[in-house]
Amino acid sequence: MPGEEALGGSGDQIANFTSEQSLPIRWEGQFGLSTLNPQLTMAGRYLETYFTPKVLAAQQQYFGRSQNIPPQPERDALTEDENQFIQSRDSFYMATVSENGWPYVQHRGGRPGFLRVVSPTQLAFADYKGNRQMLSTGNLAGNDRVALFLMDYPQRTRLKILGHARIEDARKHPELVSQIAEPEAHSIVERVVLIEVISYDWNCPKYITPRYTAAEVQEAIAPLKERIAELEAQLRRQS
């Protein structure tokens, strides 16, 4: 099972915990999974979800034809590529939908791996104390659909994920908190967010501006700094 090492436990331990604590690894979501086309893989379902009649009409209007869903590899779960990409992110964006129909996008950040892959079709992350607005939490109480954007700016890579989310009270499930949160952060975890992935799609790199963290910049310029230090040492010896 992907993510077992990151979770610090075996797949059996995860399954037993969730079963005993009434936290199923899979659930049908508030709006159900039965509406999904069983003939399509996760990647195909992503396009099917968004290729609505209005979208197809817009494609026809501006490009002279509507797009078809291209053939997809036969895989209906997150693969090792997605697993590694997800668990190396230190941030992601999550969109929810409010009761009045307005979308809300929230930035989530943490150490690389804070978004856990707990099964081939499920993600989880700890929800810490914040500004108390409870926007995403409230939105999910009325509509469990979520859309995630995971960005790798240096490599200009983007993974998009759709799923159904549920929120569990951390106080009622300390064992789950211990599996997905850093030990020093257990006391500030208020909720655990579980996401059942229904589809995903990789984006092209066009228009993604490369951005780098301070650590990545330091790593890149380290050889230059070493060379500068060598040259300065040579100058001092010659003076």
Residues covered by each model-derived region:
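Binding-site signature for planar aromatic cofactors or substrates
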Residues: 25-27, 33-239
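Charged/polar low-complexity intrinsically disordered segments
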Residues: 4-5, 12-13, 28
